[in-house]
C-alpha cells in the first residue's frame, strides 16, 4: 500500500506519497526534501519527529523508549507509514530536552 505523508517542517508543510515498505526519511529524500539525520539506523535522535496524525511502524529503531513513542515521537529513518500520516519534523531538541 502507499500512503500520503505530510511533513510539517520549519520551512512549511510538504506532502508526498510513501509506500509502506519504504522508510519515510528515504522517500522524503527521493522527493527532494532535506531532513535532518545522522546514523540512519534508528539509534540516535537526529531525525526525530512527532506524529500528529496517523500511525507508523518504527520497530527497526531502538533509540526511543515506550514513553517517547507513546508521546508520538518517531525516528523518520526507520519509520514505515501504516496509514496516511502527519509528522512534525526537526524535533530532536524537544525530544532530548
From Swiss-Prot:
Any one Pfam family match given in the protein's UniProt record, by short name: Fer2
Main localization (coarse): plastid
GO CC term (a single one): chloroplast stroma
Name of the featured protein: Ferredoxin
UniProt keyword Transmembrane present: no
Intracellular or extracellular location(s): Plastid, Chloroplast
Cofactor(s) named in the record: [2Fe-2S] cluster
UniProt record similarity statement: Belongs to the 2Fe2S plant-type ferredoxin family.
Gene Ontology biological process terms, A to Z: electron transport chain; ferredoxin metabolic process
Domain annotation 2Fe-2S ferredoxin-type: ranges: 3-93
